[in-house]
């Protein structure tokens, strides 16, 4: 007796069933068709990508993803979540009458490729370009509808020419606070030359511009330029051989990449004066359609606070502090400066003053020794570590005393690592009775405290008896009077206003606004990044390259790695890879400034990996323009301000929430500079932001804590085993190193791309993280099989639809689905859209018999944004020769969307006595009549009188008896 394979027998009986093989053939064929026809090419209003006026005349929609870094590992199924979502949304927008721009480039500069090059000897460009090609293949297989003419990589010289050009616009600009905008630096020079603006001197006097040397002029302009080089404390990572921005350092003071120790070092670095835009970056958040959580992160990062600057005299120098509580000045009993404060050396005496407490000295013989030792200690901590609420407060007395400007008292001056040079002025007045950190510091160093805000509890006004500081605004000021001013009895708000006015009148301070935001550290000691278009003359003055010399291409070097050091050796400094190519570094150039050929030295730092992503939305608009950053008409068309979008920008930008204070803030800054200078009409880059969740996966670890291959783990009785050993399971990230990565290639091979697309969109709300389950993918595959069967005979391959009119029940199901799916796709609720499609498809399947053509065609159009390949195939089988991509999305007939009947509950004394099927449009008067006439209601009343009838048509009648 022979045995048969049921699956094989089934395929023989149904040779035209939708299978993985059929899906693969369909998908490859339609992807080729889309490429050949330019299906997703969005026309510009002008230029080389101009297209048909009819399409350009449609309302536009610019949809963007945060573009990927081309990793050597390729994509796992978590990566395409956002790409599929934007593709579904873009397809829906095309079908609802929009000219849709949707494309994808590659963010290709950065440390990973450089590290790979160091390890393998492969040039970063070679490995990066290979990774890009691999990723393009993976992305194409997903059926993403991108305009491929607009794609690029940030490593393309034609692209980074304009990154360099933008840098030069920023370098050659200054922020005019009166005009509240950036202006060309040439206009500032003209003001200096004419005498309209004075050139300040350190002693407060002024000088004429003509009296300044070239170096002095460069120094003056450096104080104004929006891109400038300066010596400043930076985060130096010897293990990486480069400096890091604050955002690239973890909370425990280590590098985000590589987990190396990070130290504070003083180095000359390029910075972007993003702080000039702090107010606008804050204020313009209100016009953006962004998640409130992201807005809050940006607001907190910018950190606007109102207060006063106050001068404390120390040995003939004025040390300025910023405080948000000038009303507590009488309570300032000591000062604390950042260890790096430049005035510390000036007022540190040779010996300890008489009577210095031992606890203040740190055990050192002299103030200079104490200061030097503490500075070295502080340099080993990151800003995050320094500001952490550590139990033990550290610091050291400088040996100097300052004068409290309101009380005239002498207060000791300390340095401590919890004060940062980059925030405020790098100095604070300490009011320990009313600040938690100051209180802890005062207790640790046996410093005096004075209560100047009356506690609202019963602790009294002697801080020496308190367990903690009293920090409240809802109280009155006490112990705050001198011969010249008294704040006693005032509320906090009134006291702040009075003391600020007094400080300004006396020339001791002024009201001001401070920001937590710091200028953006913009240089890296790496090879694989954009070269700076800057050269230095023999006097060390920085000069911009003329536009004709752009792009300044990255040269070949034999060794790509920055010089790295012992990760724990703080006494090191950077050596850049580019500095080793002397033929490239030392050049003779004619910069067109009238001086003729001169010898110069190129800048050997490179730009950070954020540079290329600060403006890429603009390059998508006009990707082949070699004369302008972007054609103004094209930028205005796609990104210009319009109703509901007063600052312009991309219509939808989808990406991870982890970029809240890095890429998103930097891109906003660049856009505002370009807007101010008249290069673009959009003051904001991204109008609407959507953060997708994360696709998670289970990580399995053995007894050593080492990840084991998830695919080889077995489940038995609720426990998990790998090669017979019990392992732990924890939900986390998906990745190659965690041995739990599933590639889209695997799923596409087993089920097809449309199934993968549906599964990722159906897993849950797009903005919520969710666990991957390969076993559940088959559910969406079966949905597509049922869809196929509703149109195609599996045995013959013939189309089975009929031209008959659908019945009432089918029409209602169809139009409810159309209405719901349309709303869900517009709102990016893709999981519920798929649920509605599934419900309609299942109803048609259960009904049996052939599906009416009008219903089948509408169903295919509903599916098209979600599963475009099978939709194209079925659309073609239904007799249409044109692509489904530009068909009109179905519109629901309101008559069929409203339920034919709804259930009305009738209550007597709050208890349900009857349920009635009534029209949803029934009036309250009619519903009351129907309810009172119902036999069950009549029986329940039993002849009792009715005091009141409460009607809420069409769903409730409540009868109150007499």
From Swiss-Prot:
PROSITE patterns: AA_TRNA_LIGASE_I. It is an enzyme of class 6 (ligase). The keyword Glycoprotein does not apply. ATP binds at residue 736. Pfam families: Anticodon_1, tRNA-synt_1_2, tRNA-synt_1g. GO terms for biological process: leucyl-tRNA aminoacylation. One of its GO terms (molecular function) is aminoacyl-tRNA deacylase activity. It is found in: Cytoplasm. A motif ('HIGH' region) lies at residues 68-79. It catalyses: tRNA(Leu) + L-leucine + ATP = L-leucyl-tRNA(Leu) + AMP + diphosphate. Gene3D superfamilies: HUPs, Isoleucyl-tRNA Synthetase, Domain 1, Valyl/Leucyl/Isoleucyl-tRNA synthetase, editing domain. The keyword Cytoplasm applies. It comes from the Bacteria. Residues 570-579 have a biased composition (Polar residues). Belongs to the class-I aminoacyl-tRNA synthetase family. HAMAP family: Leu_tRNA_synth_B. This is Leucine--tRNA ligase. It comes from Streptomyces avermitilis (strain ATCC 31267 / DSM 46492 / JCM 5070 / NBRC 14893 / NCIMB 12804 / NRRL 8165 / MA-4680). The lineage of its organism: Bacteria, Bacillati, Actinomycetota, Actinomycetes, Kitasatosporales.
């Amino acid at each position: 007796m022979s045995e048969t394979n049921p699956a094989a027998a089934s395929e023989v009986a149904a040779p035209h069933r939708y299978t993985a093989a059929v899906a693969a053939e369909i998908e490859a064929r339609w992807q080729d068709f889309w490429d050949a026809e330019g299906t997703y090419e969005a026309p510009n209003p002008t230029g080389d990508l101009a297209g048909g006026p009819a399409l350009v005349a449609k309302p536009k929609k610019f949809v963007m993803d945060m573009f990927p870094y081309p990793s050597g590992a390729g994509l796992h199924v978590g990566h395409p979540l956002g790409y599929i979502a934007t593709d579904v949304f873009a397809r829906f927008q095309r079908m609802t009458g929009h000219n849709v721009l949707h494309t994808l480039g590659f963010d290709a500069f950065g440390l990973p490729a450089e590290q790979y090059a160091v390890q393998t000897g492969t040039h970063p460009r070679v490995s990066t370009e290979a990774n890009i090609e691999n990723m393009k293949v993976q992305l194409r297989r997903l059926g993403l509808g991108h305009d491929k003419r607009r794609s690029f990589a940030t490593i393309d010289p034609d692209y980074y020419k304009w990154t360099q050009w933008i840098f030069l616009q920023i370098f050659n600009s200054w922020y005019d606070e009166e005009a509240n905008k950036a202006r060309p630096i040439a206009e500032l020079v003209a003001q200096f030359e004419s005498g309209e603006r004075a050139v300040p001197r350190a002693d407060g006097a002024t000088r004429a511009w003509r009296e300044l040397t070239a170096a002095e002029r460069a120094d003056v302009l450096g104080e104004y330029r929006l891109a400038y080089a300066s010596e400043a404390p930076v985060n130096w990572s010897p293990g990486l051989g480069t400096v890091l921005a604050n955002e690239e350092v973890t909370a425990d003071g280590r590098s985000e990449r590589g987990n190396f120790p990070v130290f504070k070092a003083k180095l000359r670095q390029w910075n972007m004066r993003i702080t000039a835009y702090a107010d606008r970056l804050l204020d313009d958040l209100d016009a953006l359609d962004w998640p409130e959580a992201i807005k809050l992160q940006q607001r907190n990062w910018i950190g606007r606070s109102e207060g006063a600057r106050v001068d404390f005299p120390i040995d003939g120098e004025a040390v300025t502090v910023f405080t948000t509580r000038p009303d507590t000045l009488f309570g300032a009993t000591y000062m604390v400066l950042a260890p790096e404060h430049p005035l510390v050396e000036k007022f540190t005496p040779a010996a300890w003053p008489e009577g210095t407490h031992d606890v203040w000295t740190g055990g050192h013989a002299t103030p200079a020794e104490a200061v030097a030792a503490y500075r070295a200690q502080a340099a080993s901590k990151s800003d995050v570590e320094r500001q952490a609420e550590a139990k033990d407060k550290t610091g050291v007395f400088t040996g100097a005393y300052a004068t409290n400007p309101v009380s005239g008292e002498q207060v000791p001056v300390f340095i401590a690592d919890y004060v940062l040079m980059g925030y405020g002025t790098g100095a604070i007045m300490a009011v320990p009775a009313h600040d938690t950190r100051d209180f802890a510091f005062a207790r640790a160093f046996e410093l005096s405290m004075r209560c100047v805000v009356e506690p609202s509890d019963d602790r009294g006004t002697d801080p020496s008896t308190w367990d903690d500081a009293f920090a409240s605004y809802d109280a009155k000021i006490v112990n705050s009077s001198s011969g010249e001013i008294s704040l006693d009895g005032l509320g906090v708000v009134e006291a702040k206003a009075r003391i600020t006015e007094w400080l300004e009148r006396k020339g001791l301070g002024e009201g001001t606004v401070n920001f937590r935001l710091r200028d953006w550290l913009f240089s890296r000691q790496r090879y694989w990044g954009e070269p700076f278009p800057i050269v230095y003359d023999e006097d060390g003055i920085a000069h911009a390259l003329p536009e004709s010399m752009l792009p300044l291409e990255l040269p070949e070097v034999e060794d790509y790695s920055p010089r790295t050091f012992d990760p724990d050796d703080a006494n090191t400094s950077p050596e850049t890879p580019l500095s080793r190519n002397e033929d490239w570094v030392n050049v003779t150039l004619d910069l067109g400034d009238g001086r003729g050929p001169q010898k110069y030295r190129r800048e050997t730092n490179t730009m950070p990996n954020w540079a290329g992503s600060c403006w890429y939305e603009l390059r998508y608009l006009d990707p082949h323009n070699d004369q302008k950053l972007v054609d103004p008409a094209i930028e205005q068309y796609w990104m210009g301000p319009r109703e509901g979008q007063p600052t312009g920008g991309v219509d939808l930008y989808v990406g991870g929430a982890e970029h809240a204070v890095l890429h998103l803030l930097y891109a906003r800054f660049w856009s505002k500079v370009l807007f101010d200078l008249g290069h673009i009409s959009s003051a904001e880059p991204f109008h609407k932001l959507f953060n997708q969740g994360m696709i998670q996966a289970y990580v399995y670890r053995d007894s050593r804590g080492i990840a084991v291959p998830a695919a080889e783990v077995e489940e038995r009785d609720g426990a998990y085993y790998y090669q017979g050993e019990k392992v732990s399971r924890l939900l986390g990230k998906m990745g190659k190193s965690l041995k739990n990565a599933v590639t889209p290639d695997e799923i596409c091979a087993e089920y097809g791309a449309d199934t993968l697309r549906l599964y990722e969109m159906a897993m849950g709300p797009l903005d919520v993280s969710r666990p991957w389950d390969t076993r559940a993918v088959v559910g969406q595959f079966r949905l597509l099989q049922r869809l196929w069967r509703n149109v195609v005979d599996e045995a013959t391959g013939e189309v089975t639809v009929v031209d008959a009119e659908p019945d009432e029940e089918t029409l209602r199901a169809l139009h409810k689905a159309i209405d719901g799916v349309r709303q869900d796709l517009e709102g990016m609720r893709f999981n519920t859209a798929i649920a509605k499609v599934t419900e309609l498809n299942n109803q048609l399947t259960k009904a049996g018999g052939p599906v009416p053509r009008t219903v089948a065609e509408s169903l295919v159009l509903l599916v098209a944004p979600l599963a475009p390949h099978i939709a194209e195939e079925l659309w073609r089988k239904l007799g249409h020769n044109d692509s489904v991509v530009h068909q009109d999305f179905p519109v629901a007939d309101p008559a069929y969307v409203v339920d034919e009947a709804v259930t009305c509950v009738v209550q007597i004394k709050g208890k349900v006595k009857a349920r009635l099927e009534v029209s949803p449009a029934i009036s309250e008067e009619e519903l009351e009549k129907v309810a009172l006439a119902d036999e069950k209601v009549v029986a329940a009343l039993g002849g009792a009188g009715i005091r009141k009838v409460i009607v809420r048509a069409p769903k409730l009648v409540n009868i109150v008896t007499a």
